């Protein structure tokens, strides 16, 4: 699949999926800290924050534009600005974010023109230089546009895009580095232009821009890679006319580490916008792996650092250089974190590299600030340098340029590196992306999901003072048992036979909360004790992040955790407490509604999460079990009753197994299992008898979901019984991050109260791409509405600007005995419903005509409908053009 066909129907939707990825999330400062180890006395994030503030102090306001000042719109300025913005978002440090934004925003005039670059109203325009080094500050402008929607920024972005549209090119389409460097492609230039162009293409729905980015990357690899060395040369001259260019190949004579760093950073950053599981993305990943292999191959074994001239080691005059070393660490760390590079292969080099940077390059300056030393100030090709020396690409030239401290070409990558190393060492990396085409991909998805195992150590809660009388508060005893188990390296925290009253339980890594047969954990729902029992934590509520009552069982950034056993979890909810907050009897607004409306408005407005505080005095009910930003999770065997709200709701988790449960709870909004922005999830052998959807796969609501921008993917549902609920398996409606790769098999769904078997619910306010959903061998008895429902007019319907997309859905060997309709599909102009396939199915007891509007291709193969009706393929809107 090409990028053009991939983005053909998703132009706006994909734009929105990441359009607010870097909005300021000041609430991150309020979150529990990740567990990255300290290196040289500080965590990687702390080193980045300290370096950022050191530079902010050193440079003051000199880099902000002002009349008569010396600040200029150029690439080092843009690199530093974007690094600060990224760090400000990741760390929640508002001062860093603000400084980074102002480095770009102060250049933008009221009319959207760019001071010192393009001010057409004053007849000042540098476009004729066609200098690709002038594009990088545009990345911060893209961020500001996503954050504010200010029309000035659209105009500024258009000026930058106009340059790229007119940029001179080589005969095969590669951007010239500058007008004064004709027919030349430099590794540096890939970072200067491509990340901006890729992000632009995604935000504004321009697949041709993304295709151009891939083309630039491929050309640079084709022309500059030396397979024997495993490295890319600094530059290539198509005409072989430059003094530095080899007359046969057009290549420069040496491998300069920083130029390789620019290229590698372009690869990992552009992959944020090019799907790594599509053909073009896979090719870019293959290039990244070659770059990474070269980085590892030429790492200095003594220090873990890298040399100015990459392959020349300790040749006289060569030196270990900080800007390239920082770039290389960033490339490896982000590549691992995003799943592009195998962790075990590259982690040792990355760790030694980062430790070497801190040990050998970071120095105190005597004023409480730190310096990044050993930075090559500048290097290029062609013309002469400030010393009158020819920039001929020779070894002697590269080692002759000045060595300084705190060059922004090193500071920026150092900030990026700290963010990614922090994430990596805190265990927040993603698994490798998986390309899914159909059921043939099922074994690969299943192989990624493995339940955690625990040491054979037991910690009985009764040993810590818990009493099985159903009246004495066991919360502290359970907390102590969990802490002891965790400190010992893991095991089981055992709840023995009897009833134990408790408040919120917070799990820690390597702890299995085991509820024995005959045991009940009764969660205290007495309103007067809710503030004490369920302290405010960072959570999601109906797809929007906030600070709210703790879920009954909660984990934050933990791994290898479980809730198991044959006992019972009783949430204690009733109309006298939790459920009463959303009791819709008598047609009156519920107490929950004002808080719900306020939270949703805060999410739309981008209010920092730490300011979205609910809990005591408010009426947003907690979910029952919510591991958050955790991995390797098992929930098995227990019976769950009387949940306040959603029952099982892992958020931003990876490798989750839900197995063998009996879920019987009929309160309002009692969804059974709602994986949200999760990867690699198995739900099997479970009974769902619920007051809302049995399973509802989610990925965040509206702008807040798009800000986080993480899809739910690689989800298997098998051997489950959906006895009661609104929908059997549902995608939505909090779905703005998207859903893909869902497999459903061998399930039974049968209840007059169960409205739909498979349901998609979305609208133009949520947006999101829902794709690759496969259902087979499912027996459906009676359902109230249809076997398949695709409702894109849910709630707000078409009244929004974020196109919902549903595509590549296959229903195979599915039977029903009493469904009014086979399908109910409600789309609208601009939305996409396409490639819906029924195969080898029998639907009996069908009473009403199918409802299909706003759909593309719907096909039937070997399908029987009784009473006898002829199935037919349906296209109510034309199929998308190729």
At which residue positions do the language-model features occur?
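Extracellular "leader-to-stem" segments immediately downstream of a signal peptide or signal-anchor
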Residues: 28, 430-629, 634-637, 645, ...
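Extended ligand-binding groove/face enriched in aromatic
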Residues: 98, 108-245, 251-252, 382-384
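CBM-like carbohydrate-recognition segments
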Residues: 35-78, 90, 97, 106-132, ...
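Bacterial N-terminal signal peptides
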Residues: 11-24
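Right-handed parallel beta-helix
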Residues: 517-518, 559-567, 631-641, 654-665, ...
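Short glycine/acidic-rich loop motifs that flank beta-strands on beta-rich extracellular proteins
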Residues: 490, 504-505, 524-526, 549, ...
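Extended ligand-binding clefts on enzyme/binding-domain cores
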Residues: 187-188, 194-311, 315-329, 341-393
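Extracellular beta-rich repeat passengers
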Residues: 735, 753-882
């Amino acid at each position: 699949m090409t990028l053009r066909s991939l983005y053909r129907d998703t132009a706006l939707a994909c734009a929105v999926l990441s359009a607010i990825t870097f909005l300021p999330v000041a609430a991150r400062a309020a979150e529990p800290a990740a567990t990255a180890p300290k290196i040289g006395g500080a965590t990687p994030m702390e080193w980045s924050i300290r370096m950022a503030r050191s530079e902010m102090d050193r440079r003051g306001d000199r880099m902000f534009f002002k009349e008569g000042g010396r600040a200029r719109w150029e690439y080092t300025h843009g690199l530093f600005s974007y690094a600060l913005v990224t760090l400000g978002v990741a760390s929640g440090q508002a001062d860093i974010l603000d400084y980074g934004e102002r480095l770009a925003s102060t250049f933008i005039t009221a009319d959207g023109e760019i001071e010192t670059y393009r001010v057409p109203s004053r007849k000042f325009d540098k476009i004729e230089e066609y200098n690709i080094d002038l594009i990088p500050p545009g990345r911060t402008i893209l961020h500001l546009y996503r954050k504010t929607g200010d029309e000035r920024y659209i105009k500024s972005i258009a000026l930058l895009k106009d340059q790229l549209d007119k940029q001179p090119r080589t005969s095969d389409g590669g951007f010239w580095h500058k007008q004064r460097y004709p027919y030349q492609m430099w590794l540096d230039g890939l970072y200067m232009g491509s990340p901006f162009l890729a992000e632009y293409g995604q935000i504004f729905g321009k697949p041709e821009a993304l295709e151009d980015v891939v083309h630039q990357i491929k050309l640079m690899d084709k022309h500059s890679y030396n397979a024997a060395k495993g490295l890319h040369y600094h530059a290539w001259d198509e005409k072989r006319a430059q003094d530095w260019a080899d007359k046969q190949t057009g290549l420069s004579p040496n491998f300069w580490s920083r130029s390789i760093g620019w290229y590698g950073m372009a690869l990992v950053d552009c992959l944020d916008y090019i799907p790594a599981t599509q053909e073009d993305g896979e090719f870019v990943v293959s290039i990244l792996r070659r770059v990474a292999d070269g980085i590892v191959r030429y790492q200095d074994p003594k220090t873990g650092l890298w040399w100015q001239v990459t392959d020349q080691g300790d040749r006289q005059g060569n030196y270990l250089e900080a800007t390239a070393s920082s770039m290389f660490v960033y490339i490896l760390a982000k590549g691992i974190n995003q799943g592009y590079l195998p962790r075990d292969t590259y982690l040792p080099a990355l760790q030694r590299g980062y430790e070497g940077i801190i040990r050998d390059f970071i120095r105190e300056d005597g004023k409480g600030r730190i310096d990044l030393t050993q930075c090559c100030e500048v290097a290029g090709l062609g013309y002469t340098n400030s010393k009158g020396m020819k920039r001929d690409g020779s070894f002697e030239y590269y080692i002759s340029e000045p060595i300084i401290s705190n060059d922004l070409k090193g500071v920026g990558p150092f900030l990026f590196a700290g963010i990614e190393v922090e994430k990596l060492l805190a265990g927040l990396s993603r698994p490798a992306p998986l390309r899914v085409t159909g059921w043939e991909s099922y074994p690969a998805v299943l192989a990624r999901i493995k339940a955690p195992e625990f040491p054979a150590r037991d910690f009985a809660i009764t040993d810590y003072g818990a009493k099985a009388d159903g009246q004495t508060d066991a919360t502290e005893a359970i907390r102590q048992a969990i802490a002891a188990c965790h400190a010992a390296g893991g095991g089981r925290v055992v709840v023995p036979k009897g009833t134990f009253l408790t408040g919120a339980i917070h799990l820690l890594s390597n702890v299995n909360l085991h509820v024995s047969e005959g045991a009940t954990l009764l969660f205290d729902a007495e309103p007067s004790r809710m503030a004490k029992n369920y302290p405010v934590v960072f959570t999601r509520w109906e797809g929007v992040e906030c600070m709210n009552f703790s879920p009954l069982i909660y984990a934050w950034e933990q791994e290898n955790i479980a809730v198991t056993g044959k006992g019972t979890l009783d949430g204690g909810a009733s109309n006298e407490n939790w459920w009463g907050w959303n009791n819709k009897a008598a047609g009156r607004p519920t107490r929950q509604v004002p808080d719900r409306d306020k939270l949703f408005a805060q999410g739309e407005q981008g209010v920092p999460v730490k300011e979205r505080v609910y809990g005591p005095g408010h009426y947003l009910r907690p979910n029952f079990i919510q591991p958050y930003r955790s991995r390797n999770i098992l929930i098995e065997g227990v019976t769950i009753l009387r949940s306040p709200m959603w029952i099982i709701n892992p958020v931003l988790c990876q490798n989750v197994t839900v197995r063998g449960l009996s879920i019987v709870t009929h309160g309002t909004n009692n969804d059974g299992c709602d994986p949200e922005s999760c990867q690699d999830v198995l739900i099997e052998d479970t009974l769902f008898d619920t007051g809302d959807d049995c399973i509802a796969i989610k990925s965040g609501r509206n702008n807040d979901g798009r800000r986080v921008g993480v899809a739910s993917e690689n989800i298997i549902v098998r051997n489950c019984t959906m006895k009661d609920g609104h929908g059997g398996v549902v995608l939505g409606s909090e779905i703005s991050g998207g859903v893909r790769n869902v497999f459903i098999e061998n399930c039974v769904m049968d209840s007059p109260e169960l409205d739909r078997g498979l349901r998609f619910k979305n609208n133009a306010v949520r947006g999101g791409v829902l794709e690759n959903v496969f259902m087979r061998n499912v027996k459906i008895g009676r359902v109230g509405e249809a076997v398949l429902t695709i409702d894109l007019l849910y709630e707000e319907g078409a009244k929004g600007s974020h196109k919902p997309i549903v595509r590549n859905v296959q229903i195979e060997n599915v039977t029903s005995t009493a469904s009014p309709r086979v399908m109910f599909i409600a789309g609208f102009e601009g939305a996409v419903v396409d490639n819906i396939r029924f195969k080898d199915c029998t639907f009996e007891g069908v009473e009403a005509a199918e409802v299909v509007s706003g759909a593309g291709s719907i096909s039937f193969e070997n399908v029987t409908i009784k009473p006898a009706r002829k199935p037919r393929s349906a296209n109510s809107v034309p199929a998308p053009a190729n």
